[in-house]
Amino acid sequence: MNHIKDTLKIGSHTFASRLIVGSGKYKDFATTKEATLASGAEIITVAVRRVNIMDNKSENLLETFKDTNIQFLPNSAGCVNAKEAITLFRLVREATGIDFIKLEIIGDIDKTLYPDVIESLQATEILANEGFCVLAYTNDDPIMAKRLENAGASAIMPLAAPIGSGLGIQNRYNIGFIKEAVKVPVIVDAGVGCASDASIAMELGADAVLTNTAIAQAQNPVTMAEAMKYAVKAGRLSYLAGRIPRKAYASASSPLEGMMQFG
């Protein structure tokens, strides 16, 4: 397979990069932009409730990235039910014309930040029917992933570990099960702590990785962003190449034929 043409397709959108980055937790918009460009990402997600991308009277992310081709992905972080998220995205589309969205409805706002999948399922169906391209954040349940796909989700975004935890991929088998269960892209979201975590996610067969805290809170965000760029590429190529099977015992890499005989 020619990896040069190996693009990521989400709904009607096509991207060359399989890394998606967040915009939160940076010290300023300048660092956000520098790190995002270093990552090679073509999608940046922004929590509309925390950063008002619709405010034209002050510095905002839309203004910061206006000279780039980066696609904005508004998300509903902070929403706790379907009604809040639906209302938010309708306002976003009315103000910006953006209908490419990350649906994130949190069930446990105080501790785990785990998603409320029941509310998410309801919101996905309504928003998809209204023409939104819904990327649905969810838990690592392949049954729910399939239900979200059936409800109209254009991509499934299972968590790898709690948001911002940096614990890495805690559910390798479930990520694989989700990949088998759905036909839409699977984007590993939440829990990535370093570049190797992103690479592992891609080696498991994920179509893309979203990370924010691992870059924004790194000692050098720009350098970490570049590391993530290459990690995602390496993981994807490794997945496409096909790893060797795991074995319990050794297997010589050099042929035994023609060896010199002694004694």
From Swiss-Prot:
One Gene Ontology term of the molecular function aspect: thiazole synthase activity
Pathway: Cofactor biosynthesis; thiamine diphosphate biosynthesis
EC identifiers of the protein: 2.8.1.10
Active site annotation, chain numbering: K102 (schiff-base intermediate with dxp)
Subcellular location(s) per record: Cytoplasm
GO biological process: thiamine diphosphate biosynthetic process
Pfam families: ThiG
Reaction catalyzed: [ThiS sulfur-carrier protein]-C-terminal-Gly-aminoethanethioate + 2-iminoacetate + 1-deoxy-D-xylulose 5-phosphate = [ThiS sulfur-carrier protein]-C-terminal Gly-Gly + 2-[(2R,5Z)-2-carboxy-4-methylthiazol-5(2H)-ylidene]ethyl phosphate + 2 H2O + H(+)
Superkingdom as given in the UniProt entry: Bacteria
Positions contributing to 1-deoxy-D-xylulose 5-phosphate binding: G164, A190, G191, N212, T213
Main localization category: cytoplasm
UniProt GO cellular component terms: cytoplasm
Keywords of this entry: Cytoplasm, Schiff base, Thiamine biosynthesis, Transferase
Family: Belongs to the ThiG family.
The protein's role, per its UniProt record: Catalyzes the rearrangement of 1-deoxy-D-xylulose 5-phosphate (DXP) to produce the thiazole phosphate moiety of thiamine. Sulfur is provided by the thiocarboxylate moiety of the carrier protein ThiS. In vitro, sulfur can be provided by H(2)S.
Subunit structure: Homotetramer. Forms heterodimers with either ThiH or ThiS.
HAMAP family membership: ThiG (MF_00443)
Protein name: Thiazole synthase
Organism this protein belongs to: Helicobacter hepaticus (strain ATCC 51449 / 3B1)
Gene name, Swiss-Prot/TrEMBL: thiG
